[in-house]
């Protein structure tokens, strides 16, 4: 089954003429690397999409993809800082004036500042749920042995590749903040100058594997062949992600930082690790069957509300070919209707 949702990316296609000015962190990129140099002149920026794709652009503007990394704003409708910077906290040895960018807005917020001319991630984060400061050390991450000192945790090497668009490992610069149109559709200059279906990447027109790779490039815990970058340097939408990134896989009966012993997710950013284990993945379903990244009325950009069973029951309701072997949902779950135990995701996600 494959629904006719148009794309996984942030904007259906790109149009109008122009170019984006590369911006971003300072610092020395690698002198030699196995990946090709990124031609940032081929990027035009998401604002160029609006003229021809306004509905998709407007929807994307309200998504979490467009709110991933932003300058600090403490009040008003465009507020980006929700952490409490008043007073002192033993976990926080930096102040709001030191913050250059804010990462995240839903579960937690991390903060980027400049140290010795390089942008780094500060060692404390704000929990949006618990409303308090927490240490951010990264001890369980594979890159920690190389970056035990937080002053070496380069925003560009560990974060920017998935939090910005058109990041170049050599120049240590990005084209646009946040996960914008060209993050999922690839460089759009050629298409903007002469719009055609075949001169822009449309994830909806890719094979199932390559379409899913677009999402997994940032929604899959793993590592590259080297130890320098924590994102798939060199990958472009439409390419085979496995040539740039190796996703972690669970080991039966073993609990890791990413997985419980039964193989289910132990932390965030592992959707791309658990989904390939599922029957849905092996049946040809794509991320876009359940998620609409051009914008949705629901959290997590799902096509139907995910905080109920509505989304799952679209395909798995009683009487459906792939539904439960019972007449009613509560007969299937053995839990009272509307209770937590009756929610599909409690057992199946």
Describe each region flagged by the PLM.
Residues 150-153, 280:
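Short glycine/proline-enriched loop/turn "hinge" motifs that connect secondary-structure elements
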């Amino acid at each position: 089954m494959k629904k006719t949702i148009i794309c996984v990316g942030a904007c259906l296609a790109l149009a109008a003429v122009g170019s984006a000015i590369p911006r971003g962190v300072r610092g020395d990129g690698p002198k030699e690397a196995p990946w090709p140099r990124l031609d940032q002149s081929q990027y035009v920026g998401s604002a160029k999409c609006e003229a021809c794709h306004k509905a998709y652009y407007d929807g994307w503007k309200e998504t979490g993809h467009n709110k991933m990394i932003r300058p600090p704003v403490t009040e008003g409708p465009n507020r980006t800082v929700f952490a409490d910077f008043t007073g002192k906290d033993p976990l926080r040895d930096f102040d709001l004036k030191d913050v250059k960018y804010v990462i995240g807005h839903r579960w937690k917020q991390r903060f980027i500042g400049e140290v010795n001319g390089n942008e780094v991630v500060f060692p404390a984060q704000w929990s949006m749920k618990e409303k308090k400061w927490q240490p951010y050390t990264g001890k369980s991450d594979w890159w920690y042995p190389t970056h035990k000192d937080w002053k070496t945790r380069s925003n560009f090497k560990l974060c920017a590749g998935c939090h910005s668009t058109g990041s170049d490992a050599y120049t240590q610069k990005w084209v646009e903040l946040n996960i914008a149109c060209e993050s999922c559709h690839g460089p759009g200059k050629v298409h903007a100058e002469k719009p055609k279906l075949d001169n822009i990447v449309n994830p909806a027109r890719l094979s199932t594997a390559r379409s899913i790779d677009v999402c997994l490039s940032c929604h899959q815990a793993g590592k590259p062949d080297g130890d320098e970058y924590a994102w798939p340097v060199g990958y472009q939408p439409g390419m085979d992600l496995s040539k740039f990134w190796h996703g972690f896989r669970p080991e039966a009966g073993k609990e890791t930082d990413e997985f419980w012993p039964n193989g289910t997710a132990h932390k965030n950013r592992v959707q791309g690790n658990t989904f390939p284990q599922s029957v849905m993945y092996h049946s040809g379903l794509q991320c876009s069957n359940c998620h609409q990244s051009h914008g949705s009325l629901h959290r997590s950009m799902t096509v139907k509300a995910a905080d109920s069973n509505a989304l799952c029951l679209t395909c798995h309701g009683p009487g459906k070919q792939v539904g439960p072997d019972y007449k009613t949902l509560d007969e299937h779950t053995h839990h009272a209707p509307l209770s937590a135990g009756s929610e599909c995701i409690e057992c199946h996600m």
